[in-house]
Amino acid sequence: MVTYLLANFGGPRTSQEIVSFLQALLTDRDVTGGMIPSMLHRPLFSYIAKRRAPHVARQYAYLGGGSPIFQDTERLAQNLSQELQASVIPFHRYLPETHRETLQALQESQGSIVGIPLFPHYTFAVTGSIIRFFLQHLPEKPISWITQFGVHPEFVSCMQQHIRDCLAAQQIAVEDCYFLFSVHGLPQRHIRLGDPYAQQCQASFEALRGELEGKIAFQSKFGIGKWLDPSTQEVCQSLRTKKRHIVIVPFGFVSDHIETLHEIDHLYVPILLQKGYRVVRIPAINASSRWVSSLAAIVRSSPQETSLEPLLMP
């Protein structure tokens, strides 16, 4: 008997959870570690989270006060459970209010556990953090992990068809489009530590792009230090093409949330509109009717990692 653990980023369901969400995220040393000494890390980033909360709350107000990622992940877990004919337990990494229920369900599970982080590309800061969480909180339950699927044929074909379907629904010809494949950024210091994220993103981009005209860019930078480039904002500012439509494809995000629904729509789309382009943001792959069956195929055919130390931030 196999139990599947479907792990996503998590997001505040209401405005009341914004502070706890930000504190869980910013005090995670896999995300913000290395910036300051460890003894100062938690108190400083807890303070920063509280200071940032009003600003972030205004962004979430645009989404109705909370993120759709929670409900999307819960629904995906239910649908995937039916597809796999197995128990699928959802996990929301930075929504601490839900952790006790997840840990209890896993503790009571029988047989093996397979973790499915909903991130196409592996990074210490996200998938690595999820793996570390369970090593710390559930050490008696070994979990094998599907660590990446950005070049898996099912992901690539599902995403490509999703793009075509979205454009066809708006009667937009692919030939009249320039494609901006946007993925979450990462500090370059992580790459120097051996993080494979940049390489995996590039390989995934090349597989997805095929014959399409476009480029990859990195969004959502925060904090100090140099991050992967080019940034999505810089590409939008410098972009010159004879194509009428700019199609933004957030291919690193399985579910829509604040970084697609607010950041792309409010920061990047206006830049392109001011330059006279028509802009289309492709919804995250979670909106594809094929996604559940494609994810099930990915789960059935992907290798599982059991040697976990090399997967963690050094």
UniProtKB/Swiss-Prot annotation:
GO molecular-function term, one example from the UniProt record: ferrochelatase activity
**Reaction(s) catalysed (UniProt annotation):** heme b + 2 H(+) = protoporphyrin IX + Fe(2+)
Q: Which Pfam families match?
A: Ferrochelatase
Q: Name one GO cellular component term.
A: cytoplasm
Concerning HAMAP family, the annotation shows:
Ferrochelatase
According to its UniProt record, where is this protein located?
Answer: Cytoplasm
Recorded superkingdom: Bacteria
Name the keywords, alphabetized: Cytoplasm, Heme biosynthesis, Iron, Lyase, Metal-binding, Porphyrin biosynthesis
Its annotated pathway reads: Porphyrin-containing compound metabolism; protoheme biosynthesis; protoheme from protoporphyrin-IX: step 1/1
Tell whether Cytoplasm is among the UniProt keywords: yes
The record's section on InterPro entries has: Ferrochelatase (IPR001015), Ferrochelatase_AS (IPR019772), Ferrochelatase_C (IPR033644), Ferrochelatase_N (IPR033659)
- State the similarity comment: Belongs to the ferrochelatase family.
In short, the EC number is 4.98.1.1
Q: What is the protein's name according to its record?
A: Ferrochelatase
Any idea what job this protein has?
Answer: Catalyzes the ferrous insertion into protoporphyrin IX.
Gene Ontology BP terms: heme biosynthetic process
Q: Where does Fe cation bind?
A: 184, 259
